[in-house]
């Protein structure tokens, strides 16, 4: 009996130098059921992409025939094949012959070479493949016109030739010593349960009762839309709904058919880091017509959908609300025409609409931010930072045009974040007659002070007070008139591109989850909501009112009522505009306070460095100098003051370019005033400080408390003092946000994206990423949410063996559902102090051991890289906002003392007096100077900016041992993260 040439083929390579033959061979094998898993075209690819590629290949396609393997049922009720290394009996001695639970997989590499090839036609290459469906394969080959060649080998059924002339043989025997296999069901283990007709009927009935939700992305694309799609899909599935993607915006709703597709849990894996929207977006003309909305209604009812989550701008949301209002008439019309049944009419007679604002313009009223706005702002400041380098080198001026249509939010915030000299926005247009002169004065004044570059931001909707457009060309001409070498840069659609920033991932995720909850809680009497954010709080606003108020802004601008337009923007818009003027325009001397009210303000950095220390110092300095105050930098923390008396007065030119500088220009460390309180008091008296701003983390908070507690012994500390939290750990009591934490999260999101890419390339690798944060789990919780981590370990939620077992079960289930085809990497996030026992290395080791060859684990520790380099847009904007509020706090407290006619000069200096022998604060009039509320921590809590006395925080709201506040304000992030990773489903089960 002749022996087969190959009995256990797993990989082979076919080569040709004929391009047409290459394509024909590719088509031949795909018709036989092979799938393309990798393609290569000769170009300048990096080395890691060339692994396995032949050096003389012009083009390669790798084809794979996935093995028949053990079938298991997933938690979602789907049946998937297990990979070889997960099958029963893998690595056992029995597998040396063949696995009874998995056939061999095959990889074919097709190569197009640039070399001359000489093939022996008399002795062509020959390979043998196994198939469990020999008759179907024979029929398929006959169908495509392939030659059937009888075999002389007993174990080989027949042969054929591929277009390259290679002989391909087929056998029903997996190996020489095995028995003949005639059905793929042989490999289905355990055996598939035969379902009764009754069970099928019950399933149909149960599915009919499920809420069906469609998700649409409409209008201009925005970074973060994919995160919203992911959140809506997984939250919907978690809450027992069926979720459909409506492709190409409202166009898909009108066309129906394949444009409405149900989404499964794994369909949205890996979307967090992808910009734009994978389900497409379009501005639909058809949906604007009633017939289009009627057809959309029919398509929704036909699919059983009566809830719509719309992610788009004001136009998209307006269309959605109109659709809801017309729905009763539309569905009644469909019933009358006989297109739907009475049962369908009764079931879907009401439409639920929930809006998510996805727009880079941030032009929707009733919310602080829209999905995509801060990613766009991040792109702008990144590009302007690059421009700054060449502008300073050549002493040039740059006019930068940004998007925003009729909203100046991008223009205003980019002006603040980039340290621009001047901005043009539609809400606050300059005088038609004076703007050119005003622009010249500001730019020349800054040049005279020593600035080498000039930056002017122009919003695309910029106008003057007579509604005449102001173009970038006009601005350039004005700057040229004063002798500046000027260039125009239009950033254009690059502002929409790229991966979403950390905040937009967070915003889209939590709003997407709340949108599903809003759908389930909705009744016909509840107006359609739009999910918004005010400070750090997710709220629901009436969609109609938000859209109407947004349109009112445009109407106010058209009516030249610019004050009204400014007020109609979000609550901080007008304040931010004033903040910009205070650091860019008011240095002209027009805002100087009387000499008797001028102060000496000290600024000190305490604790670990973060990226936002310098921007906050810059704004506090420029704002104070504009009013005539003197600003002193205490260098190298309290250690520098105590040891060297390191105090330096800051001038305008010293700080003007600190807006994009990370670290600390004046130096920082963890030293505290308690090291030598007397010396600290001495230097405070020497420089006659009237106020102190301490910028830093928990050490800054501790330093403020120590200074406050020392007031009884050192009256100089009775000055108003403010702690501005700036730490990546976000562990300062009294605030839910700290400067520098957003930069850290952006850095972590990029780091984890890279790690996940590495994990996805190897398919079977999981990374355990260790993040900083001390005993505060904020950073880990937030990072887990925005990176799609399977599990997050924090100090607030103790780790035990059961927790780890559940997470390994989730990991195993995820790999099962991927079936080796999904490229999304898996990561765990582990806080550095989460557990003394279950460390990062131990968690990784446990995962690796539990994998037993099915998957492996690695650790990744970004360390101090997390602090970031250049501050993020959010940190720059908030540094400006909070630093100015700190300055105002110091000014107000001093005003009450210095202008109190009932106090003597000494009492004003001491800031207290004795009333019938009782020591009384000159600020508050309270009987104890310690309780006069002039030692405070500024913070964001809920939807408010607060000033909280440090003593109150220290005594009531601080966990001293763990160096953090008692309020775990980020706990909701863990719940949402667990819900979307599948972790919550396992624990619920």
From Swiss-Prot:
SUPFAM superfamilies: Phosphofructokinase. Residues 600-989 are annotated as: C-terminal regulatory PFK domain 2. The active site is at residue 361. GO terms for cellular component: 6-phosphofructokinase complex; mitochondrion. Beta-D-fructose 2,6-bisphosphate 1 binds at residues 670, 727-731, 772-774, 832, 864-867, 963. Its cofactor is Mg(2+). One of its GO terms (molecular function) is 6-phosphofructokinase activity. Its main location: cytoplasm. Allosterically activated by ADP, AMP, or fructose 2,6-bisphosphate, and allosterically inhibited by ATP or citrate. Beta-D-fructose 6-phosphate 1 binds at residues 359-361, 403-405, 460, 493-496. It is an enzyme of class 2 (transferase). ATP binds at residues 220, 283-284, 313-316. Pathway: Carbohydrate degradation; glycolysis; D-glyceraldehyde 3-phosphate and glycerone phosphate from D-glucose: step 3/4. Beta-D-fructose 6-phosphate 2 binds at residues 396, 487. It is found in: Cytoplasm. Its EC number is 2.7.1.11. Residues 586-599 are annotated as: Interdomain linker. Beta-D-fructose 2,6-bisphosphate 2 binds at residues 765, 858. It catalyses: beta-D-fructose 6-phosphate + ATP = beta-D-fructose 1,6-bisphosphate + ADP + H(+). Residues 1-585 are annotated as: N-terminal catalytic PFK domain 1. Pfam families: PFK, Pfk_N. Keywords: Allosteric enzyme, ATP-binding, Cytoplasm, Glycolysis, Kinase, Magnesium, Metal-binding, Nucleotide-binding, Transferase. NCBIfam families: 6PF1K_euk, PRK03202.1. Catalyzes the phosphorylation of D-fructose 6-phosphate to fructose 1,6-bisphosphate by ATP, the first committing step of glycolysis. Involved in the modulation of glucose-induced microautophagy of peroxisomes independent of its ability to metabolize glucose intermediates. Heterododecamer of 4 alpha, 4 beta and 4 gamma chains. The gamma chain bridges the N-terminal halves of the alpha and beta subunits. This is ATP-dependent 6-phosphofructokinase subunit alpha. It comes from Komagataella phaffii (strain GS115 / ATCC 20864). The lineage of its organism: Eukaryota, Fungi, Dikarya, Ascomycota, Saccharomycotina.
């Amino acid at each position: 009996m002749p022996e087969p040439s190959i009995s256990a083929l797993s990989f082979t390579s076919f080569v040709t130098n004929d391009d047409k033959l290459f394509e024909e061979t590719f088509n031949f094998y795909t018709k036989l059921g092979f799938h393309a898993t990798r393609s290569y075209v000769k170009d300048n690819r990096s080395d890691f992409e060339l692994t396995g590629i032949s050096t003389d290949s012009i083009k390669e396609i790798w084809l794979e025939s996935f093995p028949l393997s053990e079938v298991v049922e997933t938690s979602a009720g789907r049946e998937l094949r297990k990979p070889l290394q997960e099958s029963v009996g893998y690595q056992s001695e029995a597998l040396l012959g063949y696995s009874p639970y998995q056939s061999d997989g095959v990889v074919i590499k097709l190569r197009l070479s640039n070399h001359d090839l000489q093939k022996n036609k008399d002795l062509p290459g020959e390979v043998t493949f196994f198939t469990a469906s020999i008759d179907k394969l024979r029929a398929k080959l006959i169908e495509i016109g392939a030659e059937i060649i009888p075999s002389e080998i007993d174990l080989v059924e027949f042969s054929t030739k591929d277009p390259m002339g290679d002989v391909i043989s087929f056998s029903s025997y997996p190996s020489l010593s095995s028995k003949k296999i005639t059905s793929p069901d042989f490999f289905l283990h355990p055996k598939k349960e035969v379902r009764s007709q009754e069970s099928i009927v019950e399933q149909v009935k149960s599915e009919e009762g499920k809420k069906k939700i469609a998700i649409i992305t409409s209008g201009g694309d925005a970074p973060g839309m994919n995160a919203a799609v992911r959140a809506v899909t997984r939250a919907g599935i978690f809450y027992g709904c069926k979720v459909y993607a409506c492709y190409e915006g409202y166009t898909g709703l009108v066309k129906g058919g394949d444009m409405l597709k149900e989404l499964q849990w794994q369909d949205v894996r890996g979307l967090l880091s992808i910009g734009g929207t994978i389900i497409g977006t379009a501005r639909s003309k058809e949906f604007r017509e009633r017939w289009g909305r009627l057809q959309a209604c029919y398509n929704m009812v036909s699919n059983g959908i009566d809830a719509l989550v719309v992610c788009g701008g004001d136009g998209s949301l307006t269309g959605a609300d109109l659709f809801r209002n017309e729905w009763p008439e539309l569905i009644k019309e469909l019933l009358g025409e006989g297109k739907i049944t009475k049962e369908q009419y009764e079931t879907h007679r009401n439409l639920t609409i929930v809006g998510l604002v996805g727009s880079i313009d941030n032009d929707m009223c009733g919310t602080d931010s829209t999905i995509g706005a801060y990613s766009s702002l991040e792109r702008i400041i990144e590009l302007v930072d690059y421009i700054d380098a060449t502008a300073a080198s050549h002493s040039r001026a740059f006019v930068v045009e940004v998007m925003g249509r009729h909203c100046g939010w991008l223009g205003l915030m980019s002006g603040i974040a980039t340290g621009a000299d001047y901005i043009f926005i539609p809400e606050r247009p300059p005088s038609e007659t004076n703007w050119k002169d005003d622009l010249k004065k500001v730019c020349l004044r800054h040049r005279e002070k020593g600035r080498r570059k000039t930056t002017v931001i122009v919003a695309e909707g910029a106008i003057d007070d007579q509604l005449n457009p102001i173009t970038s060309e006009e601005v350039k001409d004005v700057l040229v008139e004063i002798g500046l070498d000027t260039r125009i840069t239009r950033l254009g659609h690059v502002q929409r591109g790229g991966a979403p920033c950390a905040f937009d991932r967070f915003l889209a995720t939590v709003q997407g989850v709340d949108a599903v909850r809003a759908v389930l809680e909705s009744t016909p009497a509840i107006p359609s909501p739009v999910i918004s954010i005010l400070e750090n709080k997710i709220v629901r606003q009436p969609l109609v009112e938000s859209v109407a108020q947004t349109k009112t802004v445009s109407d106010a601008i058209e009516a030249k009522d610019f004050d009204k337009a400014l007020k109609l923007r979000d609550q901080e818009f007008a304040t931010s505009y004033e903040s910009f003027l205070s650091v860019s325009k008011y240095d002209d001397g027009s805002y100087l306070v009387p000499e008797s009210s001028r102060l000496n303000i000290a600024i000190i950095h305490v604790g670990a460095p973060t990226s936002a220390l310098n921007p906050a110092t810059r704004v506090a300095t420029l704002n104070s100098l504009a009013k005539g105050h003197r600003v002193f930098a205490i260098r190298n923390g309290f250690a520098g003051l105590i040891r060297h008396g390191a105090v330096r007065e800051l001038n305008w030119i010293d700080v003007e370019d600190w807006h994009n500088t990370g670290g600390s220009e004046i130096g920082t460390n963890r030293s505290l005033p308690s090291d030598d309180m007397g010396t600290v008091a001495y230097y405070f008296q020497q420089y006659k400080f009237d106020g102190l701003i301490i910028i830093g983390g928990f050490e800054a908070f501790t330093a403020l408390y120590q200074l406050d507690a020392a007031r009884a012994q050192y009256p100089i500390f009775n000055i108003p003092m403010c702690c501005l939290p700036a730490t990546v750990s976000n562990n300062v009591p009294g605030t839910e946000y700290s400067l520098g934490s957003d930069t850290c999260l952006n850095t972590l999101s990029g780091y984890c994206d890279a790690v996940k890419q590495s994990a996805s390339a190897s398919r079977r690798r999981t990374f355990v990423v260790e993040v900083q944060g001390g005993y505060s789990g904020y950073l880990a919780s937030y990072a887990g949410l925005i990176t799609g981590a399977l599990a997050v370990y924090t100090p607030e939620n103790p780790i035990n063996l059961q927790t780890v077992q559940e997470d390994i079960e989730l990991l195993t289930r995820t790999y099962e559902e991927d079936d080796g085809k999904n490229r999304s990497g898996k990561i765990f996030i582990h806080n550095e102090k989460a557990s003394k026992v279950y460390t990062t290395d131990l968690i990784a080791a446990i995962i690796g051991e539990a994998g037993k060859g099915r998957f492996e684990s690695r650790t990744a520790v970004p360390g101090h890289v997390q602090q970031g380099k250049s501050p993020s847009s959010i940190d720059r904007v908030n540094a400006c906002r909070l630093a100015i509020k700190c300055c105002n706090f110091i000014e107000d407290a001093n005003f009450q003392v210095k202008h109190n006619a009932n106090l003597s000069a000494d009492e004003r200096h001491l800031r207290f007096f004795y009333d019938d022998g009782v020591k009384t604060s000159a600020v508050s009039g309270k009987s104890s100077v310690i309780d006069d509320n002039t030692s405070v921590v500024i913070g964001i809590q809920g939807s408010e900016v607060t000033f909280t006395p440090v003593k109150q925080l220290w005594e009531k709201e601080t966990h001293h041992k763990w160096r953090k506040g008692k309020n775990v304000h980020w706990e909701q992030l863990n719940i949402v993260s667990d819900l979307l990773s599948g972790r919550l489903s396992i624990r619920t089960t």
